[in-house]
Structure formats: structure tokens, C-alpha cells
Swiss-Prot record:
Domain of life of the source: Bacteria
Protein's recorded name: Peptide chain release factor 2
Main location: cytoplasm
HAMAP family for this protein: Rel_fac_2
PANTHER family membership: CLASS I PEPTIDE CHAIN RELEASE FACTOR (PTHR43116:SF3), PEPTIDE CHAIN RELEASE FACTOR 2 (PTHR43116)
GO molecular function: translation release factor activity, codon specific
Organism of this sequence: Yersinia pseudotuberculosis serotype I (strain IP32953)
NCBIfam families to which the protein is assigned, alphabetical: prfB
GO cellular component terms listed in the entry, alphabetical order: cytoplasm
Family: Belongs to the prokaryotic/mitochondrial release factor family.
InterPro entries in UniProt: PCRF, Pep_chain_release_fac_I, Pep_chain_release_fac_I_sf, PrfB
A GO biological-process term: viral translational frameshifting
Keywords: Cytoplasm, Methylation, Protein biosynthesis
């Protein structure tokens, strides 16, 4: 006799995941309708009078076909594999049962590829990225929290095999960091981290309070992709304020001897970038300009997507100020406020175990 319940449960799991993709994540019905429209356009004899449009339609058809066909195959495959399981049980046939499990592996692989495609479908998801951390209200406690977040993300990046480079660190008044920027290098770095943008709330008994009272503090994270040099982003030099200063934080014995650190402020948006990781002021300025270009690009993308997000009834606030996760250390509870994912293993999360939170937000299409 076979263990059929685990197999039935797996079929149900694959069916549920397929239904989620078919529904609001990929909107299968709308894509199938659009595919019919695109096919009809491409069948018109005069379509190649506009070669660029024809090529764009061909590319769109390829994308739509892959999604529609894969979902069709998954639904048919799950129906077939359910029948195969029934046949195996009725005939008490181990070979057919093993064939059922093998077919499930194939379907799981197809579904996983489609889920991955949905999670990382953005234009810059494959890119390297920058992560800005900024201590919020809460003084020393918030600055210590910013340094804890930096450590958490560095550990996470290391566990994922990404390389990291500290671009800027501004030390806190007593402990921790006022701000930091880290570059995360590796395929899909931005895709993995983009939903981490927002405010992170810490609740704990402060080690900086002699009375041991409970404090609430905030630090913000902002993730933006490294953009190609050929991306056309107009920056008027008159809109920039460039300050040079002596670097603080890590950097060795020579770090404070020259004003090599550079801070660039884009006055119309009040976006600030800074770099201090090189002894050359010129190199630091180049890096800060690259970050500014990337940050302005992401800023514009967020503005363009704001109306779309409202129309899709996404309840998350647009922008950099929305609170995304609460870390209540005294109660041993970390909860994502967008997806409801929660854990009591707070130390593991602070040591970089973020995948369950990140994957849930990506699969939810945030």
C-alpha cells in the first residue's frame, strides 16, 4: 500500500499555487484575451509597414504565450496526475505510483519557474542595487537600530552569495549609525531586495536607558537598482549642491586627514547621496553621481507607478515612508505588516534569515 496522503497534499498545494498565479498575479483571462488580439494584429497584411511596432507585438506575443501555455499545461497536468494517482491506487501498481510522483516533480519545476518569473519580472530586477539605511526618531536607540539593520542585511547578502561594498557610513553620536549606504552586487540583487524599502520599527528594552524602559524606534530602508550608464536621466548641474567633508567611520588611519568624502543634494527632490569609501574625492564624487542617477530613476518609477498601485487597490503606501515590519524583541516577535508573515526566532532574523519575509512579499506581488 502506498502513502497517498502526502501525494494528494502535494497535488492540492500545486493546484492552489497555480490558481493564485492564474488569478490576480498573472490575470490569465486578460492575458489570453490580449494574446488573441495580438495574434489578430500580427495576421494583418500591413503589420510590417511599421517594423518597430511589429517587433514589439512579436515580443509581446512570445511573453503572453509562455504564460498562457504554461498555466494551461499546469492545469491539464494536475488533472492528469490526479487521474494517474487514482489508477495507481485502484490497480495497486507501484510503477504507476512512481510515475505520478515523477510527473509531480516536472509540474513543480514548471510552476517554480513561473513563480520565479512573476517575482522577478521588473525591468531592473536582475541588477545590482544600493541599500540606504537612515536612523529615524529615537536618538541613540534609533542609530543603534540602523547599525543592527546594516548587519542584518550584510549577513543576508552573504548567505545569498552576493558581494557587498560599504559606500558610506555616518557614525551615530553615541553608538550605531546615523546613515549608511551599501552596494549589493550579484544577479537579481535588486529583485530580491526591492520590497524591503520602507520603515522598520524596533520595540525593546533599551540598553542605553539606565532604567531599562521599553523604547520604540524607527529606521528606514530604501532600495534602488544600479542603472546603466546609457539610461537617459537629465540632471541639471544647477539643481545640485555638492559638499565635501572629512570622512567618518571605517576607513583606516588616513580617513580623516583630507576632505575626500562627497555629499550631493538634488535640490528639487531633496534626494541626497554621499560616498566616502575612497581616498580620492574625484572617485567619491563619481560614485555619488552614479547613486544619484539610480536614485532619481527609482524615484521617477515610483511616481509613475503610484496611480497604478492605487487602481490595483494595493493597500501599501507608495513612497519611502510606509512601515513594513515590526521587530518586538521583548515579546520575541517579528511581523511583516504587509503579508502577515511572523516569526518568534528574532535572533535568526537579525542574523540575516530574511527569506521567508522577502519571498512572501514577492509572491504577493508587492
Amino acid at each position: 500500500m502506498f502513502e497517498i496522503n502526502p501525494v494528494k497534499n502535494r497535488i492540492q498545494d500545486l493546484s492552489d499555487r497555480t490558481a493564485v498565479l492564474r488569478g490576480y498575479l498573472f490575470d490569465y483571462d486578460a492575458k489570453k484575451e490580449r494574446l488573441e488580439e495580438v495574434n489578430a494584429e500580427l495576421e494583418q497584411p500591413d503589420v510590417w509597414n511599421e517594423p518597430e511596432r511589429a517587433q514589439a507585438l512579436g515580443k509581446e506575443r512570445s511573453t503572453l504565450e509562455e504564460i498562457v501555455t504554461t498555466i494551461d499545461q499546469l492545469e491539464q497536468g494536475l488533472e492528469d496526475v490526479s487521474g494517474l494517482l487514482e489508477l495507481a491506487v485502484e490497480a495497486d501498481d507501484e510503477e504507476t505510483f512512481n510515475e505520478t510522483i515523477a510527473e509531480l516533480e516536472v509540474l513543480d519545476g514548471k510552476l517554480g519557474q513561473l513563480e520565479f518569473r512573476r517575482m522577478f519580472s521588473g525591468e531592473y530586477d536582475r541588477a545590482n542595487c544600493y541599500l540606504d539605511l537612515q536612523a529615524g526618531s529615537g536618538g541613540t536607540e534609533a542609530q543603534d537600530w540602523a547599525s543592527m539593520l546594516l548587519r542584518m542585511y550584510l549577513r543576508w547578502a552573504e548567505s545569498r552569495g552576493f558581494k557587498t561594498e560599504i559606500i558610506e557610513e555616518s557614525d551615530g553620536d553615541v553608538a550605531g549609525l546615523k546613515s549608511a549606504t551599501v552596494k549589493i552586487i550579484g544577479e537579481y540583487a535588486f529583485g530580491w531586495l526591492r520590497t524591503e524599502t520602507g520603515v522598520h520599527r524596533l520595540v525593546r528594552k533599551s540598553p542605553f536607558d539606565s532604567g531599562g524602559r521599553r523604547h520604540t524606534s524607527f529606521s528606514s530602508a530604501f532600495v534602488y537598482p544600479e542603472v546603466d550608464d546609457d539610461i537617459d536621466i537629465e540632471i541639471n548641474p544647477a539643481d545640485l549642491r555638492i559638499d565635501v567633508y572629512r570622512a567618518s567611520g571605517a576607513g583606516g588611519q588616513h580617513v580623516n586627514k583630507t576632505e575626500s568624502a562627497v555629499r550631493i543634494t538634488h535640490i528639487p527632490t531633496n534626494i541626497v547621496t554621499q560616498c566616502q569609501n575612497d581616498r580620492s574625492q574625484h572617485k567619491n564624487k563619481d560614485q555619488a553621481m552614479k547613486q544619484l542617477k539610480a536614485k532619481l530613476y527609482e524615484f521617477e518609477m515610483q511616481k509613475k507607478n503610484a496611480d497604478k498601485q492605487v487602481l490595483e487597490d494595493n493597500k501599501s503606501d507608495i513612497g519611502w515612508g510606509s512601515q513594513i515590519r515590526s521587530y518586538v524583541l521583548d515579546d520575541s516577535r517579528i511581523k511583516d505588516l504587509r503579508t502577515g508573515v511572523e516569526t518568534r526566532n528574532t535572533q535568526a532574523v537579525l542574523d540575516g534569515d530574511l527569506d521567508k519575509f522577502i519571498e512572501a512579499s514577492l509572491k504577493a506581488g508587492l
